[in-house]
Design a protein with these regions (language model features):
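Hydrophobic/aromatic-rich transmembrane helices and adjacent perimembrane loops
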Residues: 174-175, 330-332, 344-372
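Membrane-embedded, lumen/periplasm-facing catalytic core of multi-pass transferases
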Residues: 386-443
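Specific aromatic-rich, kink-prone transmembrane helix
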Residues: 102, 133-136, 154, 158, ...
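Signature aromatic-anchored transmembrane alpha helix within multi-pass, membrane-resident enzymes
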Residues: 10-14, 203, 254, 368-394
Length: 494
C-alpha cells in the first residue's frame, strides 16, 4: 500500500472515530457525580467535598460557589500547588487535576453543555495522540499486513468502551494514552531483545522510565498493569539467561516511582489510608467477584454483542490448529491485568480496565490475519458490522447518564411553590449530583436536618436518603413522594 493511500486511510479512520465521539458528546446532557467532583477537587474547593451548603442560595449562586469559583491564573497556580501537596483524593494522583485546572483558567460558564464541550477538548487532544500511537503500536505486529493494521485501527477506534472513555470527564483517557505508550515501549523492547539488538543505554533507560511514570502516575491500579508487563520481560530475560539485565529494568521502575513522588508529595498516602483494595479483597469471596465480572461487565453492558468476534477467533483457532504459544503475549498480559484490576477495583465498572482495550482487541485482527481471501473479507466485514452495532446502542456508552434528564426535572418542577428546601444528611459529595441541575433563578434553602425546616406554606423538599425513604415516619401523611434522582428523594410538603 502506497504511503499516500495509507495516510489518507489513516486520516479517514481518525475523522470517523472523532465524528462518532462528537455525536455522543452532543447526546451528553448530564454529569456522572465523579465528573463534578473532578471540578471541585481541581479547584481545591470545600463545598461538595468537605462541607455542605448552608443557608439560602439561588441556583446560579450555588453553581458559582461549587463550580469554578476562581477562574484566574493566580488562583489556578495556588490550587495546583495545594494539589501537589495533597489533592485530598488519595486514590488518585494530582496529574489529571493539574491539567484540568489549567484548562479551566478563564472559564466561567455554569451551563452543563458549555462545561461538557470545553472540558472534553482535553480528552480529544489525548485521543488524537492515542490514535497516532495506536497506529505505530499495531505496526509492530502487522507492518507487512497494512489492511489488517487498518482493520485493527478501525475496530479499536469504534469500540464502545473506548468511545465512552473519551467522553468521560475524568483521567481515564489520559490513562489509556499512558497504558498504550508503555505497551508500545515494552513490545518494541521485547522485539529488540529477542534479536539481541536492544541497547542498554541512558536514552532507553529514560524513555522506559518516562513510560512507566506516565501510567502509574495516572492511577494506582496501573501498578498491576506495569507488573504484568514487567513479569513477561523478566521471564524473557531469564530465558536468555541475561539475569543482570533485570536490574536495568528494575532501575527504571524505581526511577519512575521516585519521579511520581517528586511530582506529587502525597503519592504514598494511599498506603496510610483505609485501603479500598485490601478491604474489598477481605470482604468478598471469589464468587462475589467473579459473578459481577461476568454478569455486569459482559451481559448488562451488552458485551454479548462481541459474540461475532469470539466466533471468528474460535473458528480460526480450530481451523489453523493454533496453540496458546501462538497468541500474542501482550493479549494474554492484558487479560491477566483486566481480571486482576477488576477483582481489586472498588466498583464493578469498565473504567478500571478500559486502558487495556487495544491490547484485548488485538486478538481480533490477529485471528483474521490467519485467514485468506474470501474468508478474511467476510470476517473483517462481520467485525466492522459488530463494532458499528455496538456503538449505536446508547446502553453501551457508559457514563452518559441519560436517566438524569428526567430526574433533574424534579428539581425544577412545581414552580408555583416558591420555597425549595434541600436537606443534606449524608456526605457532602452527594450535593455534587444535584447542584449542576438547579434552576438559576430559583431560590433554594439548604439545611442539615428536618428539624431545621421553618416553613408554614406548601413547599418542596429534596433529601439525600435511600430511595422512597421518609425522613420521619409520622410525616408520611404530609409528605407526598414525587420521585428519586441524583441520590435525593423529592417530596411535596402539604
Amino acid at each position: 500500500m502506497k504511503k499516500t493511500h495509507s495516510f489518507l486511510l489513516f486520516l479517514a479512520i481518525l475523522i470517523v472515530s472523532l465524528g462518532v465521539r462528537f455525536y455522543w458528546e452532543s447526546q451528553k446532557t448530564a454529569f456522572h457525580v465523579d465528573e463534578v467532583m473532578s471540578f471541585v477537587l481541581c479547584d481545591y474547593g470545600d463545598l461538595g467535598w468537605t462541607t455542605t451548603f448552608s443557608g439560602e442560595y439561588t441556583g446560579a449562586e450555588a453553581k458559582q460557589s461549587m463550580l469554578f469559583p476562581h477562574p484566574g491564573l493566580d488562583d489556578a497556580i495556588q490550587d495546583i500547588r495545594h494539589n501537589w501537596q495533597d489533592n485530598r483524593d488519595h486514590y488518585h494522583t494530582n496529574f489529571y487535576y493539574t491539567i484540568l485546572r489549567l484548562w479551566l483558567v478563564g472559564f466561567q460558564s455554569y451551563h452543563i453543555n458549555d462545561i461538557i464541550v470545553h472540558c472534553l477538548w482535553i480528552n480529544y487532544i489525548f485521543y488524537v495522540a492515542y490514535f497516532i500511537l495506536l497506529y505505530f503500536f499495531l505496526r509492530l505486529f502487522f507492518w507487512e499486513r497494512p489492511k489488517i493494521l487498518f482493520l485493527g485501527l478501525l475496530l479499536i477506534g469504534l469500540s464502545a468502551s473506548d468511545i465512552a472513555n473519551t467522553i468521560f470527564i475524568r483521567e481515564y483517557m489520559l490513562q489509556e494514552l499512558g497504558a498504550l505508550f508503555l505497551a508500545y515501549i515494552v513490545v518494541k523492547s521485547v522485539i529488540e531483545i529477542k534479536k539481541d539488538a536492544y541497547q542498554y543505554n541512558i536514552k532507553n533507560f529514560l524513555i522506559t522510565t518516562f513510560a512507566i511514570w506516565a501510567i502509574i502516575f495516572n492511577g494506582y491500579f496501573q501498578f498491576v498493569y506495569v507488573g504484568v508487563l514487567g513479569l513477561y520481560l523478566v521471564w524473557m530475560l531469564c530465558q536468555k539467561k541475561d539475569y543482570y539485565k533485570i536490574i536495568y529494568f528494575a532501575g527504571t521502575m524505581l526511577a519512575a516511582v521516585a519521579l511520581c513522588y517528586v511530582c506529587y508529595q502525597g503519592f504514598f498516602k494511599i498506603l496510610t489510608e483505609d485501603n479500598k483494595v485490601s478491604g474489598g479483597l477481605s470482604a468478598r469471596t471469589l464468587r462475589g467477584y467473579f459473578s459481577p465480572f461476568l454478569f455486569y461487565s459482559l451481559f448488562v453492558m451488552h458485551y454479548t454483542l462481541y459474540i461475532p468476534y469470539l466466533f471468528i477467533i474460535a473458528y480460526v483457532w480450530r481451523k489453523k490448529r493454533m496453540s496458546i504459544n501462538q497468541v500474542p503475549w501482550i493479549f494474554i498480559a492484558a487479560v491477566i491485568y483486566s481480571v486482576a484490576a477488576f477483582w481489586t477495583a472498588p466498583m464493578r465498572t469498565n473504567r478500571y480496565i478500559v486502558s487495556a482495550t487495544p491490547l484485548l482487541l488485538l486478538i481480533v485482527p490477529f485471528a483474521i490475519s490467519k485467514l485468506q481471501g474470501k474468508q478474511q473479507k467476510i470476517a473483517s466485514g462481520l467485525c466492522i458490522l459488530t463494532a458499528v452495532v455496538m456503538m449505536c446502542f446508547k446502553g453501551n456508552i457508559e457514563n452518559m447518564n441519560f436517566d438524569k434528564d428526567e430526574k433533574a426535572n424534579l428539581l425544577n418542577n412545581h414552580s408555583e411553590m416558591p420555597t425549595y428546601i434541600v436537606i443534606n444528611k449524608k456526605q457532602p459529595w452527594t450535593q455534587c449530583d444535584i447542584i449542576p441541575y438547579l434552576n438559576d433563578h430559583r431560590h433554594y434553602i439548604f439545611v442539615n436536618s428536618v428539624e431545621e425546616i421553618k416553613c408554614n406554606q406548601p413547599h418542596i423538599v429534596s433529601i439525600d436518603c435511600f430511595r422512597g425513604e421518609y425522613p420521619v415516619e409520622k410525616m408520611k401523611q404530609q409528605w407526598e413522594y414525587k420521585g428519586y434522582g441524583s441520590f435525593y428523594n423529592h417530596y411535596i410538603v402539604k
